[in-house]
Regions:
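Short hydrophobic clusters on alpha-helical segments that form packing/core surfaces
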Residues: 26-34, 107, 174
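Amphipathic alpha-helical packing segments from all-alpha helical-bundle domains
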Residues: 78, 82, 129-157, 164-168, ...
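Helix-turn-helix
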Residues: 25, 33-67, 71
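Alpha-helical DNA-contacting segments of helix-turn-helix folds
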Residues: 62, 69-79, 83, 121, ...
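Hydrophobic/aromatic-rich alpha-helical bundle segments in the mid-to-C-terminal region
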Residues: 154-200, 208-219, 230
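Hydrophobic alpha-helical connector segments
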Residues: 71, 85-113, 167-170
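Short secondary-structure transition hinges
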Residues: 109-147, 183
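Single conserved hydrophobic/aromatic residue that forms the stacking wall/gate
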Residues: 1-11
Length: 230
């Protein structure tokens, strides 16, 4: 009985692994096609043929190419926040405001390095999709960014009036202002804009704070600040 149950568990894990591989193949292929051919010129047949999976497999996960596009934005954004969260843990930063500044810095640096990802995310991003990214389970199937954000906040002992609205405001600010700085160096370069952005984020956090404590802006000589050059 125990042997057969053990074999059943192994089979189940293998099945889940195969499903994940197929879904990842669809995601990776769709991303490549959407960013080279464009959404309009890409068909579901293009995606499944290049990914090497059956069309029926595609419909197990997605309704149509617009659905995979939306889920892909969530997936890519979720991966980005997952890596940012890992980086902030590795940096051993415990203060909530510093964690937020660090994560924003990390994400901006990654998007500055990967313009294709920036273009794809920014073209297709809406708060609903972002919320999906926060709630998406990441590599270990246990992590999701929004819960981690709430956990970081709880551990800090700080209190904010509406944590979700605060996060929304910060992300909307970063997304809408940094796009031109990264892609076109307009109105200024990202390097020049960063200090203003961080001060504005601190102002947003102060506005939402119930503790009336001032969030310290990271400076270039702060140990935990990541010195990124745009």
């Amino acid at each position: 009985y125990y042997a057969s149950r053990g074999l059943g568990d192994v089979y189940k894990r293998q099945l889940e692994l195969n499903k994940k591989k197929k879904k990842d193949a669809l995601f990776n292929t769709a991303f490549e096609l959407f960013t080279t051919k464009g959404l309009t010129k890409t068909t579901i047949s293009d995606i499944v043929d290049q990914a090497g999976v059956a069309k029926g497999t595609f419909y197990l996960y997605f309704k149509d190419k617009y659905d995979i596009r939306n889920k892909l934005v969530s997936h890519k954004t979720g991966e980005l926040f997952f890596r940012a969260h890992e980086a902030v843990q590795n940096a051993h930063i415990s203060e909530f405001d510093r964690q937020v500044h660090f994560i924003i810095d990390y994400i901006l640096t990654e998007l500055n390095k990967d313009r294709t990802l920036l273009l794809f995310i920014s073209k297709n991003l809406a708060w609903g999709v972002f919320k999906g990214a926060f709630e998406e389970k990441m590599p270990d199937d246990e992590y999701n960014f929004y819960q981690s954000y709430l956990d970081m906040l709880a551990q800090s002992g700080l209190h904010y009036k509406n944590p979700e609205l605060m996060l929304f405001t910060i992300i909307e600010l970063v997304g809408s202002t940094c796009y031109s700085c990264i892609l076109y160096q307009q109105p200024v370069s990202l390097a020049e804009y960063r200090p203003y952005l961080h001060r504005t984020i601190s102002g947003i956090m102060e506005t939402f704070s119930q503790d009336h404590t001032t969030c310290e802006v990271l400076s270039s000589d702060t140990k935990t600040h990541v010195d990124h050059t745009a």
